[in-house]
Curated annotation (Swiss-Prot):
Complexes and interactors: Homotrimer of disulfide-linked HA1-HA2. Interacts with human CACNA1C.
Protein name: Hemagglutinin
Name of the coding gene: HA
Modification after translation, per record: Palmitoylated.
Function, in words: Binds to sialic acid-containing receptors on the cell surface, bringing about the attachment of the virus particle to the cell. This attachment induces virion internalization either through clathrin-dependent endocytosis or through clathrin- and caveolin-independent pathway. Plays a major role in the determination of host range restriction and virulence. Class I viral fusion protein. Responsible for penetration of the virus into the cell cytoplasm by mediating the fusion of the membrane of the endocytosed virus particle with the endosomal membrane.
GO molecular function: host cell surface receptor binding
Extracellular side, ranges: 18-528
HAMAP family (UniProt xref): INFV_HEMA
Marked site positions, Cleavage: R343, G344
Keyword Glycoprotein assigned: yes
Sites where a glycan is attached: N27, N28, N40, N285, N303, N497
Cleaved signal peptide residues: 1-17
Amino acid sequence: MKANLLVLLCALAAADADTICIGYHANNSTDTVDTVLEKNVTVTHSVNLLEDSHNGKLCRLKGIAPLQLGKCNIAGWLLGNPECDPLLPVRSWSYIVETPNSENGICYPGDFIDYEELREQLSSVSSFERFEIFPKESSWPNHNTNGVTAACSHEGKSSFYRNLLWLTEKEGSYPKLKNSYVNKKGKEVLVLWGIHHPPNSKEQQNLYQNENAYVSVVTSNYNRRFTPEIAERPKVRDQAGRMNYYWTLLKPGDTIIFEANGNLIAPMYAFALSRGFGSGIITSNASMHECNTKCQTPLGAINSSLPYQNIHPVTIGECPKYVRSAKLRMVTGLRNIPSIQSRGLFGAIAGFIEGGWTGMIDGWYGYHHQNEQGSGYAADQKSTQNAINGITNKVNTVIEKMNIQFTAVGKEFNKLEKRMENLNKKVDDGFLDIWTYNAELLVLLENERTLDFHDSNVKNLYEKVKSQLKNNAKEIGNGCFEFYHKCDNECMESVRNGTYDYPKYSEESKLNREKVDGVKLESMGIYQILAIYSTVASSLVLLVSLGAISFWMCSNGSLQCRICI
């Protein structure tokens, strides 16, 4: 009875003891992140680094409208296909939009030489000046400048390219021509021309009066001599002849010289180019809307400051880097493991606290105390703020380093460069895989470091309290300490702010600690006596029982007993 009473008193004393616990914040967040060692770790706070949404629209880029080619393509626009007349007034744009199935390109059949390279050059042009390089009325007085064809009809009538002149015989003669232009524009000038290849000698004679014609085009770094290739060909757009189209970029101060005695499709208009790093060409079926953006893709505009996107690899403007990842989320908070009430209030970050506190809302790490005056939470503002500053700086640094926004336009290859195109795709895929791997690895490593950082902070807070209390309190697990003395709210605050007065409470703690130890010792002594008594009594009962059984068996003859002297 005495032992039971002492044990009960000890239990009551423990139940009334003041306690303080170290813990961390938890909330109802369902955000999950991946680390090097774990997947789908639920955390209290995180930031998304991957943009996966767009508005499905073509928008102005930094306030400047794009050039929509509509049913025309680059070739039809630059040569001046009559069906592209609405594009003639255009002088500037933010980017150029082609549709996948544009109908109006070159109208007279033939090849546009180095067309893909020209598109690449135009991808960095944001405006141009269209000007008469060789005026129609004065440049070719001895030749007919009104050549037209049904292949380039407009409104039901034969016509021709708006930027070129088809020079033919005049009054039965095609005298040798020579004309030049000096670039005084102070910028590169794009010059286009063509060479006509008739289907037979009769047409050659009728148009140019010369069966041995040639065309010569010369600049300081371009020198070509062309001769017509007269041959029967299958009809395209009802034409058995062909025209090949050529271009060159004339540098400032340079001169271009045209010399011919037939078959020249002469330039009438040229373009003084102004380069712009934010321009580009995209192929898209999206429609134009009244909106503004800093980043345009063929699928739609992206308005985001995130460093990565998985929407489209082709982008115009200040755009996130394209990666193939489906998720890139960086942790900024803690593991989110709310404490389970059936286990008690306190429970483990860093392996010694089983769960976080949803009741602590003003910090990441802190305390929960319980004494005669009640109980409550208090965040440790200093460690929380230091952690927030460190993680915020880290996230900003990561985003700043990876947020290299730029234009990524597709490369152009003609049908004869299929192997080069395939090789380029493999190279691009390789770079894309590297970018994706680097982005994912960076996030995994930083998430691991952040969660370890939080674990370390909680441990440090625990050790800070432990070093103050020393033997004035005992560790009871789950990040908690039980005081050997009364600790009111003022005392609790001193523990939290690091000013706990150990000597002040050491005498009271010593007495209470000795009482508790004495109760344990006395209880242990009584239990030992009871154990010995129980063992002896059990042995005596066993011996008496064995003797009774032996006497009974002897009396009925089942057991013979012989006593020898």
